[in-house]
Design a protein with these regions (language model features):
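Conserved alpha-helical substructure of the radical SAM core
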Residues: 79-226, 231
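Acidic, low-complexity/disordered tracts enriched in E/D and polar residues
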Residues: 1-58
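Short Fe-S-cluster ligation motifs
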Residues: 162-180, 455-489
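Radical SAM/AdoMet-radical enzyme domain recognition
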Residues: 158, 162-178, 187-311
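Short acidic, hydrophobic short linear motifs in intrinsically disordered regions
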Residues: 61-75
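C-terminal accessory region of radical SAM enzymes
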Residues: 327-361, 391-438
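Detector for the c-type heme attachment site
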Residues: 139-145, 275, 432-433, 446
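Cysteine-cluster motifs in flexible loop/terminal segments that predominantly coordinate metals
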Residues: 418, 422-469
C-alpha cells in the first residue's frame, strides 16, 4: 500500500468512479482521508488533495491541462506550484507503470472457464433440526420448518452426509460442516454422534473436519459449551443487540422475550471459549436503523467478535428495510468505523465481520470472481438428506439438486450456479466493488428479482458502503503500524 503525504480537509464524504475501457478507479473521501482504489490490482492508496484531483483527471487530460486546472483550483495555496503538480503527475505515472494504478481487467476471460472447472464439494450445511424453540418474526426459515414439516435429522442421515462429503471432496483436506437449523441444539445428541463419526474416519481419509455450530442460545448449558469448545472451529451466537430490540422480534413460543435467558449463557460461553473462534451475529431491521447502538451494546456485554446483517424479508413486511433507510444506514457504518478505531486506541478493540479485509492478501481471484460456491462447492442437506444450493434455498423444490444417496442429479440447476459469477451480471459491469462482493448473494438476488443472476440493488449499496468503511479502517490501521503522523482516528 502506497501512502502519500496528507493534507487534512473538512469532514465529508464524496465518491466517484473512473471507468475507462478496461480500467477502473474508485475515489472517495471518508473520515478525513482521500482514498483511491485501483479495482483490478487491488491497490489502495491514501493520498493528499492534489494527488486525489490529479488522479481524477489523469486519463482524460494532458499534463499541461492538468497543471493549468490544478493551478487554478489551488490558486490560494502557495505550496501548490507548477513543479509540485508536475512531480505529482510523475508519481501517478510511476504507480501506473508499477501496476498499482489504472490497471487493466485481466480476469474476465477466467470467468468463462468457471462452468468447465471440475469443482469438489468443500462444505456442507447440515440442517440438523427443522424445528425451533423461538418464534422469530423475521425468520426466513419459517420458524425453522422451511415451509415444510418439523423434523430432526437422524444419525443415519448425518453419517451418510459425512460420507458423501468425503466422497465428493477429492484431494481437499480441510472440510467444513455447519450445524444449522432451526435450532441445532434441539438435536444435540445427533450433533455429537455425527462429530464423533467424522473424527473416527478423518485420518483414514486424510481429512480435517472443521465444525461450526449456530445457536439461538436457549439450550446452551455446560455440556454444550464443553463440547463446542472441544470440537467446533467456530460458533455463531444469535443476538440482535439491545434488550428491547432483541425481544421485539426474537420471542419464545409463548410470546416472551429471549434476551434475559440467552445473554448470560452467551457470556459464559465466550468466557470459556478462550481464543477459539466465535462471533455474535445480529440482524437489523427497519425498527433499529440505529444498529450501531446494538453493536456497541453487545461489545459492552463483553462480546468482541461481532456481525450485524440487514434483514432479508419480503418488501411489504413491517420490519423490512426501505430505500429511504439507506442514508441512515450509511451514516451508521461510518459511525461504526470511527468507534472501532477509537476503541482500539483505548485498548478495547472489537472485530466487525464486514470490516475484516486484508489489504496485502485476501481470497484468490477465482473466489473473488465466483463467490461462496453455493450449489457447487457448498450445499445444504435437509433432515431427509436432500441437497440444495444453500440454506436459503431449502424448501424451494425447483432448486433441489439431488440427495446424499444418489448425488447431484439436477445438473441444470447446478450449472446455473456454476455460471454465477461477477461477469455474468451485466449490472455489475461498471461496479467498483465487484471483485470484493463476487456478484453478491445468489439467494438474495433470487428473492429480490426472481433470478439467481439478478441484482439486489439495496444490498449492493449497503455492501459498497461497508467496503468503503472497511478499506478506510484498514488503511488507518496500516498507517498506525507504520507510525504515520496522520494516522489519527
Amino acid at each position: 500500500m502506497i501512502i502519500k503525504d496528507y493534507r487534512r480537509f473538512p469532514k465529508g464524504l464524496t465518491a466517484f468512479l473512473l471507468s475507462n475501457g478496461d480500467i477502473m478507479i474508485h475515489q472517495y473521501k471518508l473520515n478525513g482521508y482521500n482514498i483511491v482504489l485501483d479495482v483490478y490490482s487491488g491497490s489502495v492508496h491514501a493520498v493528499d488533495d492534489l494527488a486525489y484531483d490529479v488522479i481524477a483527471m489523469y486519463k482524460n487530460a494532458t499534463k499541461e491541462q492538468i497543471i493549468d486546472e490544478m493551478l487554478s483550483k489551488y490558486a490560494d495555496n502557495p505550496e501548490i506550484t507548477k513543479e509540485e503538480i508536475s512531480e505529482c503527475i510523475d508519481d501517478v505515472k510511476e504507480l501506473e507503470e508499477q501496476g498499482k494504478l489504472f490497471t487493466d481487467d485481466k480476469y474476465e476471460n477466467l470467468a468463462f472457464d468457471f462452468k468447465k472447472r471440475n469443482t469438489v464439494i468443500k462444505a456442507l450445511c447440515l440442517h440438523i433440526a427443522h424445528t425451533c424453540n423461538l418464534n422469530c418474526e423475521y425468520c426466513f426459515a419459517s420458524q425453522g420448518k422451511y415451509h415444510g414439516e418439523r423434523a430432526l435429522m437422524s444419525f443415519e442421515v448425518g453419517k451418510r452426509a459425512i460420507d458423501f462429503l468425503i466422497e465428493n471432496s477429492g484431494s481437499r483436506v480441510n472440510l467444513e460442516v455447519d450445524f444449522f437449523g432451526g435450532e441445532p441444539l434441539m438435536n444435540f445428541d445427533v450433533v455429537k454422534q455425527i462429530v464423533a463419526y467424522a473424527r473416527s474416519i478423518e485420518k483414514e481419509h486424510n481429512k480435517n473436519f472443521r465444525f461450526t455450530l449456530t445457536t439461538n442460545g436457549m439450550l446452551v448449558d455446560d455440556d454444550v459449551i464443553e463440547f463446542a469448545n472441544k470440537e467446533c472451529h467456530n460458533v455463531v451466537l444469535s443476538l440482535d443487540g439491545r434488550k428491547e430490540v432483541h425481544d421485539h422480534l426474537r420471542k419464545t413460543v409463548n410470546g416472551k422475550g429471549s434476551y434475559d435467558i440467552i445473554v448470560p449463557k452467551f457470556q459464559e460461553f465466550v468466557k470459556k471459549r478462550g481464543n477459539k473462534g466465535y462471533y455474535v451475529r445480529g440482524t437489523y431491521t427497519h425498527n433499529n436503523t440505529d444498529f450501531t447502538n446494538d453493536i456497541f451494546h453487545m461489545a459492552d456485554l463483553g462480546f468482541t467478535e461481532l456481525s450485524m446483517e440487514p434483514v432479508v424479508c419480503a418488501p411489504d413486511d413491517p420490519y423490512a428495510l426501505t430505500y429511504d433507510d439507506l442514508p441512515i444506514l450509511f451514516e451508521q457504518y461510518e459511525i461504526l468505523a470511527k468507534e472501532m478505531l477509537k476503541r482500539e486506541k483505548e485498548g478495547r478493540p472489537l472485530t466487525f465481520y464486514h470490516y475484516m479485509i486484508d489489504l496485502k492478501g485476501g481470497p484468490c481471484i477465482y473466489k473473488r470472481i465466483s463467490g461462496c460456491g453455493s450449489g457447487t462447492e457448498y450445499m445444504a442437506v435437509t433432515p431427509w438428506g436432500d441437497l440444495y444450493p444453500c440454506h436459503q434455498f431449502v424448501g424451494e423444490e425447483a432448486f433441489k439438486l439431488g440427495d446424499i444417496y444418489t448425488g447431484v442429479t439436477n445438473k441444470k440447476i447446478q450449472d446455473e450456479f456454476a455460471s454465477c459469477n461477477v461477469y455474468a451480471r451485466k449490472e455489475c459491469a461498471d461496479c467498483w466493488a465487484r471483485l470484493y462482493c463476487s456478484g453478491g448473494c445468489a439467494a438474495n438476488a433470487y428473492h429480490a428479482t426472481g433470478s439467481v443472476k439478478g441484482v439486489y440493488k439495496e444490498g449492493c449499496e449497503l455492501f459498497c458502503k461497508r467496503l468503503e468503511c472497511a478499506l478506510a479502517v484498514a488503511i488507518i490501521r496500516d498507517m498506525k503500524e507504520k507510525n504515520h503522523e496522520d494516522a489519527d482516528c
